[in-house]
Amino acid sequence: MQHDDVIWDVVGNKQFCSFKIKTKTQNFCRNEYNITGLCNRSACPLANSQYATIKEEKGICYLYMKTIERAAFPARMWERVRLSKNYEQALEQIDESLIYWPRFIRHKCKQRFTKITQYLIRIRKLTLKRQRKLVPLSRKVERREKRREEKALVAAQLDNAIEKELLERLKQGAYGDIYNFPIQAFDKALEQQEDASASESSEEEEEEDDEESGKREFVEDEDVDESDLSDFEDMDKLGASSEEEKSSGEEESSEEEEEKAPKAKSKGKAPVKGQLIRKRQHVEIEYEQETEPQHKAKVT
């Protein structure tokens, strides 16, 4: 049968213990079931037959309990209870499981559970947070990279100065038809000139558009038929022929008033253009002039 005082006398009172760590100020215990981590009578898991502690496995907290009834069965000595992830519910589970246990054990279990919960929360925050990865670099490689950067900077400045000088000489016409410089610089200069000419042409087009903005024009209607146009042409021809007839009639009226008096009375006033259009289709009139007294011939 297990006797706690005998075990403590053997292990704790200046005797050998494989879990004990001695220091100048205090002794510590490395046993994984120790509730406080200190080597003393109340916290020793070997010298207490009724004992309880909190352990964490893969982010989950468990309550371990040991009683004197299971001391004869080492394989079933510890009873394990899984605690809830909710902090308040886990504390209630500890109180219910350790209701008849010493107050010291119950208080230390809650304290240990609180510490474990805090460092689990801290681990989750660190995993979600971005961390800088420090890559070691030897001094030799660092000096080499620095020298390469300086050389590249000097070469870039030299290339820019040469390009600028060559472009100035090209503008001044110092080379004529021979260009002994990189073709990229020449292409860049040509592109700049093309951009300048394009901008000038666009400005001229804008000015022309501004000048022609107030101009008015007459545009032909696309819905007019050819038959309508032919009718307008016939009207113009008939109007011109009627004017010719009228002028010739006025010249001859003075000479032929006596002969044509009855005919003139029958005709009356000058016909309207609409009537002329209808008569033009059936009647044609011709006039002849002679040295003798003129005679008008009517042809039907």
UniProtKB/Swiss-Prot annotation:
Biased composition (Acidic residues): 201-212, 219-234, 250-259
UniProt xrefs under InterPro entries: Mak16 (IPR006958), Ribosomal_eL28/Mak16 (IPR029004)
GO cellular component, one term: nucleolus
Transmembrane residue ranges: none
Gene field: mak16
Protein name: Protein MAK16 homolog
Region (Disordered): 191-300
Annotated organism of origin: Xenopus tropicalis (Western clawed frog)
Domain of life: Eukaryota
Gene3D superfamilies, alphabetized: 3.30.390.110
Compositionally biased region (Basic residues): 263-281
Location relative to the cell: Nucleus, Nucleolus
Record key words, sorted: Nucleus
Similarity comment text for this entry: Belongs to the MAK16 family.
